Amino acid sequence: MQSFGQDSYLLTRPSWEEMEQPGRIFRWQGYEGGPEVIVVHPPFFNSHELTVEGVSECIERLPEGYEHTLLCLGVGDHGGGPTEAQIAWVREHREAIDGWRMEFSTLDGYVEIARQSRDRLPTVVGELQPHAIGCYSVYRPVKVALRRAEHLLAQAELLSQHDEETRQALDDGWKRVAFHHFHDTLAGSCTPTAYISVLDQLGGACAAADEALHFELRRRIVDLPDDSLQRIVMLNANDVPFHGFLEHEPWIGPWAKRWLKDCYLVDENDQPVPFQTMDPEPIAFSDRNDTVLPRIFFRADLEPGELRVVRIARGGSNGTKLGIKVEANEAISSDSGARWSMAGLAWGDGPTLPVGLSLLRDMSDTWSHGLLRFSEEAMEKVSWGDPKIIDSGPLMASAIVSGTIGESKLTAEWRVFAGEPYIELKLDVFWAERFRILKMEISTPSPSDIRLDGVMGTNLGRKNDGSELPMRDWTLLGDAASPRLAVVAPDVYGLDARPERARLTLLRSSMMAQHDPAPPLAPRAVISDQGAHTFRFRFFFGESLSVEDLDRHASAMQRPVVVTDATGGMPTIY
């Protein structure tokens, strides 16, 4: 906050019951130290009637001997101000509280007084959490849409200067994104009908950014020299390097059926590029015996902002070295030692770490008012079928397994990769629950009282005490003196942990816009988050896991390389 010129903060949440606070005014400092922010936690009176007894609350919880306090009053719902009657009441009762005098002032005026008394204020170190723990995960569509808009806009802005019209479209997109960070919109606590406009606006921001991104890519393709071979063009629209695998379905014309016989990839210098073919997304073009329109899976390395090409050549073969293994029991493993089986995740000679899914009972309101943690008891565990091997190398092996939990259906696709230490999961959930929470439970490799979580702009060490807290992109689990487990999960926004396990909160199914007390189920109640959801995970294990690598992987998942075809210079066939 200080780096953006904000040295004070008016606190309304967390409440006194949710977090221990030293008083109504204190200094707030991050774990990393540095400049402090003055935090003021005043009482708010959003009612028409004022009483001396009520407003006297503002003189409680002050540092000993502190002679100034703050009272906020008015009427309205997320806005408004004092009425004429309230103003008259304050004037009439200016000195009604013994030893104190009420004066009309401003927040800036009060904070300036606090700055002069900074040394007398207590200090709080760390995050101001938790509050309304249900909001970390409820109504997932708005959270996914907002994060997608943020990353697409960031990608579009990383490219060269845009024309005025495009620049204005991106600016308008950022305004939409900033507006929908509002604490009820992003929190998932608005009415269902309100989210129609919210998602439309965030979709518009995504569309503007996506259009700018692809128009810029097309402009760069025009500048490429002609080539007699068809090319796959890659642009890393990111501020960090990309090292990993890409998937692309090139349109290779009427000779597509020959792909498996004599097509292969080469780079700009005619050197072979390792690859494998996969089933394409359109089922109509898939034939496992003779792929009609294959999806190409290949490795790429790109610097920030770099554009590169690979070329589709003919008359050769795929000489890619096998880097994965499919075992007789349907387990899959990589040459880096990463292994998945139905029993769990393993690396080398390390322990097998189970990954499970559980349903919890959750009768709390939309915000989960009054709760600091969710139930420890699972109502039901997931029931999986038998795994089926889908891809078997040479660069990637995958297994798909379907399951059920409650009334919901799940499909999990597990992958391992040649030369990569992580295990990847794509989890599709068709959510059909009421008053339930879906948690992913992961065993930690070594018990620890502390974990490291990604948070906005940085990371924080947190106690594994079972409290529900928000997360950004990843968590790092286990004793720092032993190999640890890292989970990169950019589509998950809340978790809790104990020394021996962590539970990532995937979905809730509360009534929308329901504030306790309320009827058990209103006739027109809308249950949140029903339908299809997709989650992406990468699991790492080792002694030298760095936060920089975890952030890089999360960034690659959130800001994927842009891939397309280029045919300039190819001979015509029609």
Predicted features and spans:
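C-terminal (or distal) subdomains of carbohydrate-active enzymes
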Residues: 3, 10, 16, 22-25, ...
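Loop/turn elements at helix/coil->beta-strand transitions in domains of secreted/extracellular proteins
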Residues: 4-8, 33-36, 65-70, 97-101
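Structural recognition of the beta-strand scaffold that forms the well-ordered cores
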Residues: 8-11, 27, 37-40, 71-72, ...
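Short low-complexity, flexible loop/linker segments enriched in glycine and/or proline
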Residues: 23-28, 202
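Acidic (Asp/Glu)-rich catalytic clusters
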Residues: 27-32, 60-64
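Flexible glycine/proline-enriched surface loops and loop-helix/loop-strand junctions
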Residues: 67-76, 137-138, 157, 500, ...
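Short acidic, S/G/P-rich loop/turn micro-motifs used as interaction or catalytic elements
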Residues: 77-81
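Metal- or metallocofactor-binding catalytic centers and their adjacent structured scaffolds
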Residues: 113-228
